[in-house]
Amino acid sequence: MAGLALREFEVLIAIPGKLNIGPHTKTLIDELVRCARAQHYLSVIVMAAALVDVLTHEGADTNFDEAAEEEGFGLSMLRVNERRALDRLRGMRNRILHYQGPSEGLSGHVSDKDYLQAQAEAAIKAILPLLELQEMY
């Protein structure tokens, strides 16, 4: 997979220390890149969705006290279309992991590969704005 989104993703992560991320996020990023290069499209989608969860929670001090104030910005800094892209990513991940009947891209049809490649590209594109929020200036 050598799409534009993967190239943008690789440029964003190319400089060590450019992103303010923890070890869990770094491991998932490395795995996502390996999966994308190997054309493991389902894995790219799942890794991208996992990255969203980790990026919104890693490093935050979790306080389960109901009186505690919420910490971090989560996804609130994203534009509406960026948030919708993450919602579509989550939906695709759920269709992969939780069987609910036949699903596009998982039918055994010849066109599945092209569909999944496009979905993997969209998954990477969806997480770019969230990663950009982690840039250190």
Where in this protein do the model-derived segments appear?
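Short, hydrophobic, well-ordered secondary-structure elements
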Residues: 29-60
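Residue-level recognition of alpha-helical structural elements
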Residues: 21, 37-41, 82-85, 109
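Residue-level detector of well-ordered alpha-helical segments, enriched
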Residues: 24, 40-47, 85, 92, ...
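Short, charged amphipathic alpha-helical segments flanked by flexible coils
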Residues: 59-91
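Charged alpha-helical initiation segments
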Residues: 1-40
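Charge-enriched, short contiguous segments at helix-coil
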Residues: 80-137
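A short secondary-structure junction motif
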Residues: 58-62, 96-99
